[in-house]
Amino acid sequence: GPVRCRPPERRGSSDSTASFQVIFNFEFLLMSTILPLAYLPSVEYFTHLLRGGCVVDLGEHFVKRSERNRARILASDGVMELTVHVRNANRPRQPVRDVRLDYSKRWQHQHWGALVASYRSSPYFDFYAGRFEPFYRREWEFLADYNLGLLEVLCSLAGVPMPELSRTYVEAAPGDLD
């Protein structure tokens, strides 16, 4: 997924009209990685988390057909796409934190069935299944809450620290990588 890197602003700036939220308190300029909030993030996503200095941007605008509500798993017959259905996906400039889940289709049932069919013969599946199944049984209101809950479980199981969260949109700056 897209990764924007930039040095964080220093805390205590006297410019009260700045359109950014101060996220870190570092003495010197360091690079931070701004990540989208992803559904069942990829291995690449976790490599960024392991490097540290990551911020998940909850204020970014929702992008249709992206990792925010799509994931890919390896099924017995190849790669399978999983899509979390959301309401009003076409609303322009909608922050990810405001995107609501749509339960008119049985996507949770389909996703859990695909995960079980693909991984039930894997070692320790029964141990891990208990941590993930609630995400496919309970109805969540917001995509961000759903994805954050999954990310917390994944990070906990993998021993990876949770990233910082920014609830304010982080504007791209000149020199950012995208």
Question: Where are the predicted features?
Answer:
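Residues lining hydrophobic/aromatic ligand-binding pockets adjacent to catalytic sites
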Residues: 31-178
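Serine residues within intrinsically disordered or low-complexity segments
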Residues: 13-19
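Short, basic, low-complexity termini and linkers enriched in Ser/Thr/Gly/Pro
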Residues: 23-31
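Intrinsic-disorder/low-complexity regions
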Residues: 14, 24, 175-177
